[in-house]
Amino acid sequence: MSFSRTEAAPAATLPDLAATLAAPRDGAFLQLGAAFLTRQPAAPLPAPYVVGFSDDAARMLGLDPALRDAPGFAGLFCGNPTRDWPQASLPYASVYSGHQFGVWAGQLGDGRALTIGELEHDGRRYELQLKGAGRTPYSRMGDGRAVLRSSIREYLCSEAMHHLGIPTTRALAVIGSDQPVVREEIETSAVVTRVAESFVRFGHFEHFFANDRPEQLRALADHVIDRFYPACRDADDPYLALLAEATRRTAELVAQWQAVGFCHGVMNTDNMSILGVTIDYGPFGFIDAFDAKHVCNHSDTHGRYAYRMQPRIAHWNCFCLAQALLPLIGLHRDAPSEDARAERAVEDAHAVLGRFAEQFGPALERAMRAKLGLELEREGDAALANQLLEIMDASRADFTLTFRHLARVSKHDARGDAPVRDLFVDRDAFDRWANLYRARLSEEARDDAARAAAMNRANPKYVLRNHLAETAIRRAKEKDFSEVERLAAVLRRPFDEQPEHDAYAALPPDWASTLEVSCSS
């Protein structure tokens, strides 16, 4: 583990770790200055205890997983010791704004998250952020706390998405407390330690654009380019290149969401990462019975963030990012006037945004081709995949199990169809599609066994279904955290058979259909 110009051994004790986190480092977000953030200690969390811990995330950070058992671990990762840190080492909350449900909402956060420092390992730097660490100057009406329920969901989904191969923030730990907080009912507090190379959002850029602060806007863009998109610095227009890269990553990310049936639930612009990673797990959900119009957030009464809408919303959010970057685009070129520069900037930004569909479509087609076990590219492959989704929608066939069981279908005959066919109400419709699928498979050189193995590497058996998370949460509320870690362990091997855990891959029980998730966390 190291920091910028200083090499250091991995933190072996909690005091070492605390000192490392608090050390100043070159190029960190906090060096942007007071216009971007406020330093403050975390609010005390009484009698904290460990609810969940990711050995895998710890190793990514160069930490010894045994640290979780050290006295004071829970205290450090709910922020309690930060009250005694010097002013120059205090955690910070950053300021950002954004659009919520398509409407400009102004300043939004960080309302309950404090970044406590950075760690570097294997040449990569990571920020550690405590979500639920108390009120900040940007909290608006909130109490600054997160609840155990939502914190467990974020921890589990962060780990699940990472092991599905989808870019995401990570979760090192969940720390709980019996401190009560009021939501729709009385719940208990928790803090999630989130990990990412950066927590900069589209909303950070929107904040400085909306407040007419061009110097800060440019400083933020330069920080992101220099730290995360260095190749953009060599482009003819670095800021246009930044927009292009962020748009491309966003398009490819949402294609990966669609391919596993993941609904984010609240794709506001302040919940969009400039690095194109999944961030802010709130009212998310993996689709069970497939419905393209599925809305996982019961607060989303108009279905703005439905599954089928996610690509369109991601594109719209990129337009918001582009608008925020317009004052910077073209600054490196000579223009006869500011009006001419601005007019050209709009044209260039539109050209970048116009490529979103060209990036999203092929990314989704590649993913769907892998899910169908197709190596060769054929013109009708996208139509074949869409036809499957249509009959899945009509029968409300389980999304995850349908694709997983497709691996059993033979290219020669229908003997292996039963497991997937039985998921459909309209089995004649499936039979018609399966005949088309078999005809397409006949063009492939791979035998059934090789294709099935490849498909099982593309189609997870295990995803974080809402009822699985709910079961773990209910037990955790009774101070039994074993199911949280058991479920996390299963989700870290989503493509493996794990026959001893078949129950986690089964169709949801009837009571799962009554579960609702919302922005209340």
From Swiss-Prot:
Function: Nucleotidyltransferase involved in the post-translational modification of proteins. It can catalyze the addition of adenosine monophosphate (AMP) or uridine monophosphate (UMP) to a protein, resulting in modifications known as AMPylation and UMPylation.
Any matching Pfam family: SelO
Catalytic activity from the UniProt record: L-seryl-[protein] + ATP = 3-O-(5'-adenylyl)-L-seryl-[protein] + diphosphate; L-threonyl-[protein] + ATP = 3-O-(5'-adenylyl)-L-threonyl-[protein] + diphosphate; L-tyrosyl-[protein] + ATP = O-(5'-adenylyl)-L-tyrosyl-[protein] + diphosphate; L-histidyl-[protein] + UTP = N(tele)-(5'-uridylyl)-L-histidyl-[protein] + diphosphate
Chain's gene name: ydiU
EC number: 2.7.7.-, 2.7.7.108
Species whose genome carries this gene: Burkholderia thailandensis (strain ATCC 700388 / DSM 13276 / CCUG 48851 / CIP 106301 / E264)
Catalytic residues (UniProt): 270
Highest taxon in the source lineage: Bacteria
Entry binding sites for ATP: 109, 111-112, 131, 143-144, 194, 201, 280
GO MF term list: AMPylase activity; ATP binding; magnesium ion binding
Residues binding Mg(2+): 271, 280
Keywords annotated in UniProt: ATP-binding, Magnesium, Manganese, Metal-binding, Nucleotide-binding, Nucleotidyltransferase, Transferase
Protein known as: Protein nucleotidyltransferase YdiU
UniProt family annotation: Belongs to the SELO family.
InterPro entries the UniProt entry points to: SelO (IPR003846)
The protein's required cofactors: Mg(2+); Mn(2+)
